[in-house]
Amino acid sequence: MNFGKLLHFLNYTDRSYYDVYIPSKTAIKTEYVNNKKTDIQYILRVYENRILIAFRGTDSCRDMMSNLQFFKKTVCHMPDSKKIRIHSGFYKAYTEAKIFDKIVKVITDKTKRIEITGHSYGGALALICAADLAHRFPDIEYEVVVFGTPRTGNKAFAEFFDKYLPNTSRIENRGDIITKLPPPLFGYRHVGKTYRIGSYHIPFFYSFKEHSLCSYRHKILK
């Protein structure tokens, strides 16, 4: 992946952790969304023909509870819906926050490209959001870059990305334990192209320390 592009997505993911966001002079609209009911935070930035969405990662006990709900849920409105299943905790949080309803209001006939990013739990939300938008707005160009993201859906979900969202990249810090969850034993699969950074300090040793966005930034800029 191009380093400049990687840094672009990393910077916006980093900014999603700020509670106050400074508007851009070049954007038509910049909004920091904090849904207190679901404890989901994300940045929504709108340009004339482009939209950028950046989701914050795990930031509270509520987020952790969503992460631990390993059961999968069938998604009825997507192609091959009988086969596609998504992590129930992530999907419930996404739908309850009405993220799609918020984004669809800023999509216009001029919208040609949507960029979506996120870290950790926010990366999982970014993937669900991308799949939802790509299904409903197939003529728009999408680019998705996520950092330290857990497995979010099953094999059919991964195949959906291969077909409809081929420009999806997953950045994985070697040693990041969250990227190993939920286990494949539960039927979960990663999506998109995988780019691994860093190195193992001890073979097959994973930790939460390697999961922080600061660790990702350090390894990328090193």
Which residues are covered by each model-predicted region?
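Non-catalytic, mobile gating and regulatory segments of ester bond hydrolases
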Residues: 1-117, 121-222
